[in-house]
Amino acid sequence: MHPNYVSWLGAVGFLLWALLCLGAWTEAYPVKPENPGEDAPAEELAKYYSALRHYINLITRQRYGKRSTPEILDTLVSELLLKETSDTLPQSRYDPSLW
């Protein structure tokens, strides 16, 4: 095989992989509801506004889990690991009688 052919094949493979990843990312994102227009009946507008409210709630929802309580974790780390007591302070080994 020629080196030029291999490099082109690698570039095409990378582009296909990037397009597949981009497609998978966009499918996971919720679809924005279609606006029925200003002259739509009241029932369709109510459905649209309900769907829009649901869409906005999905986009801006709180994320629960590890990211929701960093302050508590910071205080636990500082209290448990960084707490200075007389036991954790290094003791001097200097003994004047040895000199």
UniProtKB/Swiss-Prot annotation:
Query: What's in the keyword line of the UniProt record?
Result: Amidation, Cleavage on pair of basic residues, Hypotensive agent, Neuropeptide, Secreted, Signal
Spell out the subcellular localization from the entry. Answer: Secreted
GO BP annotations, alphabetical order: feeding behavior; neuropeptide signaling pathway; regulation of blood pressure
InterPro entries per UniProt: Pancreatic_hormone-like, Pancreatic_hormone-like_CS
Q: Where is the signal peptide?
A: 1-28
Annotated GO CC locations = extracellular space
Pfam short name (any one): Hormone_3
Tell me where on the tree of life, at the top rank, the source sits.
Answer: Eukaryota
Annotated CDD domains: PAH
The UniProt record lists the keyword Signal: yes
Where, by tissue, is this protein expressed?
Expressed by the venom gland. Heavily expressed in the venom gland transcriptome.
Q: Which residues carry this modification: Tyrosine amide?
A: 64
Gene3D superfamilies registered for this protein in UniProt? 6.10.250.900
Which Gene Ontology molecular function entries are recorded, alphabetically? Answer: neuropeptide hormone activity; neuropeptide Y receptor binding
* Primary role: Neuropeptides Y are crucial for the regulation of cardiovascular processes such as blood pressure. Venom of Meiacanthus fangblennies shows a potent hypotensive bioactivity (tested on M.grammistes), but has no effect on the heart rate. Therefore, finding a neuropeptide Y sequence in M.atrodorsalis venom suggests that this protein act as a hypotensive agent.
Instruction: Relay the record's extra comment.
Output: In contrast to venom of most venomous species, the venom of Meiacanthus fangblennies is relatively painless, when tested on mammals. While species-specific nociceptive effects are possible, this defensive venom is surprisingly multifunctional, being markedly hypotensive (via neuropeptide Y and/ or enkephalins), weakly neurotoxic (unknown components, possibly PLA2s), and perhaps also pro-inflammatory (PLA2s and/or enkephalins).
State the family named in the UniProt similarity comment for this chain: Belongs to the NPY family.
Supply the name of the protein: Pro-neuropeptide Y
Record the organism: Meiacanthus atrodorsalis
